């Protein structure tokens, strides 16, 4: 099994190209099931979850082709089965997003209950209840959600609590439903908005994008388009955190700075000099001291849960004490015990991680437990004294494209080993 080996401490310098957002690409790939003609997607990151999604679509009879620029053409005109099997769904929670499109276009869907990261319970009840309100008959049998409907009918649905995948699934179900659907307390994440823009380009009628109330007027059919996936704000934030930790100056390119407003505010509070253009962000931490920052994670546009682990590492080396409170998912401090092995002073109480800054971290063998936790261990390795070996990095490969190559280009001493 692959490991990442990092020789620290590292000084970083230069710029890094940010990939397309995994959390936008996955629902958009599923959304291609709604189109009766081929769709061409660009800026899709080459990640394990994307490969799994393409395999999942292929098992349904979807034709998938890549061109020389690695754009993906998806033709869902001749689907042979409306089932998402356990073998593929178990590795990736986003597979549940096949349910809305299949039910909307074909009136039937059979989707295995999902797997993915080991973070909290993440219930799928909101998806099921929403589709039932739209007229679907749903039963859960032998680990599968089996849904049928003649044609979905528009409904007024309030989602409690806010759910990103729930919003996306019901949005895709609603675009071909008869009449108007209103989704209240909808997630406002940029990735949800990207899916909505994609659906509209295919012929959907969605208004209220970027707000917590989405209104969808059902249409008869959607047709294929060319579409470019938005950049990955969490990948961008991770490289900026690496710059802050290593007291370096790094520019992330091909980003949307407005998607990171809450994060950039915290970098500034931590003592960094942050400058932006239309599509770049530069963080300069040279000759500056890292200050502790208190953080509470909340749905967008507040501070994202997917940047929490990176800021815990920053707080480990900041001058003073700080609290990071996680309100979105359970079990999201699994990286803490590994950071403690590297010399960090962190105490977890419930959903709060309390850190006291230390002078330095020491390299150690550590184990990744989930996607963002594994990124935080790499960041710790970049700044720690000596060798850090991060194992179980298949978690990293689910969400970060070419991570060792990108860090290597910035000057890090990092390589992949078996």
UniProtKB/Swiss-Prot annotation:
Residue positions of the active site: 117
2-(S-cysteinyl)pyruvic acid O-phosphothioketal modified-residue sites: 117
Bilayer-spanning residue ranges: none
Annotated residues for binding of phosphoenolpyruvate: 22-23
Pathway(s) annotated for this protein in UniProt: Cell wall biogenesis; peptidoglycan biosynthesis
E.C. no: 2.5.1.7
Gene Ontology CC entries for this record: cytoplasm
Predominant subcellular localization, coarse grouping: cytoplasm
Gene3D superfamilies, alphabetized: Enolpyruvate transferase domain
Cysteine pairings via disulfide bonds: none
Cellular compartment(s): Cytoplasm
Chemical reaction(s) catalysed: phosphoenolpyruvate + UDP-N-acetyl-alpha-D-glucosamine = UDP-N-acetyl-3-O-(1-carboxyvinyl)-alpha-D-glucosamine + phosphate
GO molecular function: UDP-N-acetylglucosamine 1-carboxyvinyltransferase activity
Assigned keywords, A-Z: Cell cycle, Cell division, Cell shape, Cell wall biogenesis/degradation, Cytoplasm, Peptidoglycan synthesis, Pyruvate, Transferase
Chain's role: Cell wall formation. Adds enolpyruvyl to UDP-N-acetylglucosamine.
UniProt name for this protein: UDP-N-acetylglucosamine 1-carboxyvinyltransferase
Organism lineage string: Bacteria, Pseudomonadati, Pseudomonadota, Gammaproteobacteria, Thiotrichales
Record gene name: murA
């Amino acid at each position: 099994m692959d490991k990442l080996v990092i020789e620290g401490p590292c000084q970083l310098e230069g710029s890094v190209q940010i990939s397309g957002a995994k959390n936008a690409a996955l629902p958009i790939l599923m959304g291609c099931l709604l189109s009766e003609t081929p769709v061409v997607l660009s800026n899709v990151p080459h990640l394990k979850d994307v490969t799994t999604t393409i395999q999942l679509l292929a098992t349904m009879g979807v034709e998938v082709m890549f061109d020389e620029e690695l754009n993906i053409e998806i033709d869902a005109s001749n689907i042979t089965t409306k089932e998402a099997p356990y073998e593929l769904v178990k590795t990736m929670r986003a597979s549940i997003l096949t349910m809305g499109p299949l039910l909307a276009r074909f009136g039937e869907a059979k989707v295995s209950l999902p797997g993915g990261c080991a973070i909290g319970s993440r219930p799928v009840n909101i998806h099921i209840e929403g589709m039932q309100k739209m007229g679907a008959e749903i039963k859960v049998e032998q680990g599968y959600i089996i849904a049928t409907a003649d044609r979905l009918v528009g409904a007024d649905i309030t989602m409690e609590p806010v759910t990103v995948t729930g919003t996306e699934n019901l949005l895709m179900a609603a675009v071909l439903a008869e009449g108007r659907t209103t989704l209240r307390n909808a997630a406002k994440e940029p990735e949800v908005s990207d899916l909505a823009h994609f659906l509209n380009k295919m012929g959907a009628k969605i208004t209220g994008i970027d707000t917590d109330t989405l209104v969808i007027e059902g249409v008869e059919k959607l047709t294929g388009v060319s579409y470019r996936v938005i950049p990955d704000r969490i990948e961008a934030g991770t490289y900026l955190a690496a710059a802050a930790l290593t007291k370096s100056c790094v520019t992330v390119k091909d980003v949307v700075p407005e998607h990171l407003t809450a994060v950039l505010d915290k970098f500034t509070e931590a003592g960094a000099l942050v400058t932006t253009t239309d599509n770049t962000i530069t963080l300069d931490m040279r000759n500056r001291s890292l200050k502790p920052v208190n953080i509470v994670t909340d749905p967008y546009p507040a501070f994202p849960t997917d940047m929490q682990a990176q800021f815990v590492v920053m707080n480990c080396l900041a001058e003073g004490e700080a609290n990071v409170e996680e309100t979105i998912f359970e079990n999201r401090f699994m990286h803490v015990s590994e950071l403690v092995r590297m010399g960090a002073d962190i105490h977890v109480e419930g959903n709060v991680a309390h850190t006291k800054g230390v002078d330095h971290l020491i390299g150690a063998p550590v184990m990744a437990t989930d996607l963002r936790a594994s990124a935080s261990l790499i960041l710790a390795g970049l700044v720690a004294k000596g060798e850090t070996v991060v194992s179980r990095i298949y978690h990293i490969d689910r969400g970060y494209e070419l991570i060792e190559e990108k860090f290597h280009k910035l000057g890090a001493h990092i390589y992949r080993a078996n």
